């Protein structure tokens, strides 16, 4: 019996059943039976009928296999599950029961489009005439007019979501920056992302050397007892060759980024960071004239992947973290030597569960990166790391950095840069508020995770960035795109 009353449980169960069937080699036979296993009937649980519920599961299975949920595929990692959509109201402004049907009719007077008319018990808004300007809501002395909007549309920082004639959400692939916030915010789970769990499992079964690259934001996501060593032990039990901290790539990126920043600063040029793919997508799609200002340094994920492949050209590298945009970096940017796949926490946990492996408490004995590399998962972490490296190498330029925390701040900073009014020398952009720890696929709320995370990181040794990088052959691979 599967608990389909929670969207989180529904997502996890679909991923688990697909992963289990993939390991057992029965996915082709099981694919059409999974919806019936999960939705037994005869009574529906969360939709109008069991057939719609099963169709939702069916489309989620397609996403789990890396396909679009329907027949059409626009190539976007983020997809609308149409069978799960259309339950949200389209009308942006509605008159609530708080309306006193007063004689003043300030709402009607405030509307310039004739969209409001008096009703028998309260005013009425004609959605065909309403321009969603909000003047009626501001004018009402009883605050009786509410602004009701879809969570997916509200969460999108680049206005990439609209609706079709049936009220189903539509993602504009040309605008979408793949941040994944819409998928996280939809309370019906009507937006999801493609996964590579079947590909990863196929490579594990084929005996390939598969390496996990674990995001620095992971520490704190699963409580203080689940350490990097916990993850390392778990993925090795599943069949991975090893696990490497992406924070090590943060140290590597820091060195290269510092060199770029110093060169640009001395030449009077401005730059942006390149490690957040959501931020990079925002620049390329919405501020294309600034694309040349993006740092050419590869992301920490790519740096670690290149390091691994420099030693073992046949290695398969898999990023694991709370980020949806990392999937876009893998699928869309096609950077040589980058990670082959990217998984979120639910996806890697589904793979573990399919092999009866659980994350278990372990002493935090495993450390690849410096504390600064670990803080790459926080907004401002890149800046702090680069400035620390400059200090260690005695390059004390008075560099000013705009730390853009979240998509809204990124847009503001880029607008200033575009107009030549940015006072700082560089922009560190993080599309998710709080940084990677606020990613849409996070396992824990930001405030709670941050407290645990800071405690865990304090227990790490305080090695210097320059000393840490001496352990690795940095000349065996390139740090640039």
Segments the model singles out, each with a brief description of its role:
Residues 88-109, 138:
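Glycine-rich adenosyl-nucleotide cofactor-binding module
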Residues 67-75, 107-108, 200:
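Small-residue-rich
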Residues 71-96, 113-114:
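N-terminal [4Fe-4S]-dependent radical SAM core
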Residues 104-127, 131, 135-177, 181-197, ...:
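Iron-sulfur cluster-binding cysteine motifs and their immediate structural context
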Residues 95, 126, 172, 214-215, ...:
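A secondary-structure boundary/capping signal
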Residues 102, 131, 147, 177, ...:
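Residue-level recognition of alpha-helix initiation/capping sites
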Residues 1-60, 64-66, 193-481:
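Iron-sulfur-associated redox domains of electron-transfer enzymes in respiratory
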Residues 86-94, 117-122, 163, 181, ...:
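Gly-rich Lys/Arg/Thr-decorated short loops/hinges at beta-loop-alpha junctions or inter-strand turns
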């Amino acid at each position: 019996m599967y608990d389909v009353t929670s969207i989180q449980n529904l997502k996890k169960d679909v991923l688990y059943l697909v992963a289990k069937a993939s390991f057992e080699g029965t996915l082709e036979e099981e694919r059409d039976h999974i919806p019936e296993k999960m939705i037994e009937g005869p009574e529906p649980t969360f939709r109008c009928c069991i057939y719609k519920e099963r169709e939702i599961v069916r489309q989620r299975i397609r996403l789990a296999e890396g396909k679009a949920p329907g027949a059409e595929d626009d190539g976007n990692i983020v997809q609308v599950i149409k069978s799960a959509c259309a339950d949200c109201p389209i009308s942006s402004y509605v008159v609530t029961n708080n309306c006193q049907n007063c004689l003043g009719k300030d709402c009607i007077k405030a509307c310039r489009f004739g969209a409001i008319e008096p009703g028998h018990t309260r005013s009425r808004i004609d959605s065909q005439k309403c321009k969603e300007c909000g003047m009626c809501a501001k004018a009402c002395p009883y605050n009786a007019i509410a602004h009701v909007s879809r969570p997916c549309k509200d969460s999108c920082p680049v206005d990439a979501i609209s609706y079709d004639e049936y009220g189903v959400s539509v993602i504009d692939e040309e605008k979408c920056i793949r941040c994944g916030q819409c998928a996280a915010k939809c309370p019906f789970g009507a937006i999801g992302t493609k996964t590579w769990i079947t590909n990863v499992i196929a490579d594990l079964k084929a005996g390939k050397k598969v390496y996990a690259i674990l995001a620095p934001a992971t520490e704190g996501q699963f409580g203080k007892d689940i350490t990097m060593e916990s993850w390392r032990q778990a993925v090795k039990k599943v069949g991975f060759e090893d696990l490497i901290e992406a924070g090590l790539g943060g140290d590597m990126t820091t060195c290269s980024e510092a060199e770029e920043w110093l060169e640009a600063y001395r030449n009077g040029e401005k730059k942006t960071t390149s490690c957040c793919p959501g931020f990079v997508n925002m620049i390329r799609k919405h501020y294309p004239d600034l694309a040349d200002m993006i740092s050419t340094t590869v992301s920490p994920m790519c740096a670690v992947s290149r390091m691994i492949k420099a030693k073992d050209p046949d290695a398969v590298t898999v990023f694991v973290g709370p980020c949806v945009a990392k999937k876009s970096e893998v699928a869309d940017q096609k950077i040589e030597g980058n990670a082959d796949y990217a998984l979120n926490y639910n996806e890697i946990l589904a793979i573990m569960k399919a092999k009866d492996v659980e994350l278990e408490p372990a002493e935090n004995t495993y450390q690849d990166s410096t504390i600064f590399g670990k803080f790459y998962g926080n907004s401002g972490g890149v800046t702090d790391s680069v400035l620390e490296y400059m200090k260690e190498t005695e390059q004390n330029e008075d560099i000013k950095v705009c730390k853009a925390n979240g998509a809204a701040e990124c847009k503001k900073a880029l607008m200033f840069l575009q107009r030549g009014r940015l006072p700082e020398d560089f922009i560190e952009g993080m599309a998710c508020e709080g940084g990677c720890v606020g990613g849409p696929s996070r396992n824990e709320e930001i405030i709670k995770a941050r407290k645990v995370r800071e405690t865990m990181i304090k227990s790490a040794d305080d090695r210097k960035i320059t000393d840490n990088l001496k352990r690795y052959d940095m000349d065996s691979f390139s740090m640039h795109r």
